Curated annotation (Swiss-Prot):
Its EC number is 2.6.1.-. It comes from Alternaria alternata. It is an enzyme of class 2 (transferase). One of its GO terms (biological process) is branched-chain amino acid metabolic process. Signal peptide: none annotated. The keyword Zinc-finger does not apply. This is Transaminase AMT5-2. Keywords: Aminotransferase, Pyridoxal phosphate, Transferase, Virulence.
């Protein structure tokens, strides 16, 4: 069994001060296949080539039969590497698979693949002192059979890719401006909104680009049935905080058409530990004017403050004047607690983190054949 010197220290070949959210070359990824002959997912393979060889008529490419996840690994003060609530990602991955006829990846295999992907790329986990940076983990699964017919696929592929990243956006200090999307709905009332499938994201890219050109860093979706209730941002969840007479209340939209965000759930638990009231319920757009602070929340965005929310059709602009830099702000308290738990400088009272296992203790297959380009 090979020894990998796990965990390796952060690579000196990476400029850790200049990370973005764009991929850089790492050692490889984990890949598993599902075939009808055995009717189960096969053993993990470590593949050094980031490219996949996929038939052009694969249902994933033609009909969108694919799912994905987003999670992170962090380096702690002692040098160990931690995952944050990975079992919740495994559960959500299976939930997404159920929407698009992909065989669910068993939780044990999902976690094993994630541990291997991180462990075999441990030198790409950012150093502990690069606060906010992490090793981003992207599990994907897709139908890889060759068929032109809209029919059940029989071959599937499951992969786990990794890359070191900085926060996607911090909106530090003043926060980001958000635009309410009015020309396209994110998800139908009985659609796939609660699943991480590409079809929930690709249709909004053009709108996001236009919004960015107009100075908006976020796009916010209302419910598709009435366009009166808050759902979520295009790529992150929504959280609002209201302070009345010294009493702090966190408000979180609750709808079957939004993604069950692991970061949002964590923020709710942290808020409750502060003694704040947490309300998961339907949130009307008009209620946003009553909030003291608002955030975009997710694995990539972490916790990003919102400065203003604009809705063109009603000529409404709701502004938030909170000093997000203040140590007393809800934003600062929530963010520092979450990052402290993730990176090991605060006690993990909830048992959310999981130390990455040494890949030397696992038996997996290393593929040396590269994909065709």
């Amino acid at each position: 069994m090979a020894s990998y010197g796990f965990p390796l220290t952060a690579s000196s070949l990476v400029d850790w001060t200049s990370l973005t959210f764009s991929p850089i070359e790492v050692n490889g990824h984990i890949q598993c296949t599902y075939s009808p002959e055995v009717a189960e997912w096969g053993a993990p393979h470590f593949v050094k080539d980031p490219y996949l060889r996929v038939h052009g008529l694969a249902p994933a490419l033609n009909y969108g039969q694919q799912i994905f996840e987003g999670m992170k690994a962090f380096r702690t003060p002692t040098g160990s590497i931690r995952l944050f609530r990975p079992k919740m990602n495994a559960v959500r991955f299976a939930h997404s698979a159920s929407f698009v006829a992909i065989p669910p990846v068993p939780e044990a295999l999902f976690l094993r693949a994630v541990h291997l992907a991180v462990g075999l790329n441990s030198e790409f986990v950012p150093p502990y002192d690069s606060r906010g940076s992490a090793l981003y983990i992207r599990p994907i699964a897709f139908a890889s059979s060759a068929t032109a017919n809209l029919a059940p696929a029989d071959h599937f592929t499951f992969c786990v890719f990794v890359m070191p990243v900085a926060p996607l956006s911090t909106g530090a200090g003043q926060g980001l401006r958000a635009l309410v999307v009015e020309d396209v709905d994110r998800a139908a009332p009985k659609g796939t909104g609660s699943a991480k499938v590409g079809g929930n994201y690709a249709p909004i890219v053009t709108t996001m680009q236009r919004a960015k050109a107009d100075g908006y860093g976020l796009t916010l979706h209302l419910d598709s049935a009435t366009h009166t209730m808050v759902d979520e941002f295009s790529a992150s969840g929504f959280i609002g905080v209201r302070v009345d007479a010294g009493k702090t209340t966190m408000v979180v939209p609750d709808s079957p058409t939004i993604l069950r965000s692991i970061t949002v759930d964590s923020m709710c638990r942290i808020a409750e530990s502060f003694g704040w009231q947490v309300q998961r319920r339907a949130v009307s757009f008009t209620e946003l004017a009553e909030l003291s602070e608002a955030f975009a929340v997710g694995t990539a965005f972490i916790l990003t403050p919102v400065r203003a929310i604009t809705r063109p059709c009603t000529h409404t602009c709701i502004e938030y004047t909170a000093d997000y830099r203040s140590s007393a702000s809800a934003y600062t308290r929530l963010l520092e607690t979450l990052q402290g738990i993730q990176q090991g400088w605060l006690d993990d009272a909830w048992g959310w983190t999981e130390e990455v296992q040494d890949p030397s203790s696992d038996e997996f297959i290393t593929d040396t054949v590269q994909a065709r380009r």
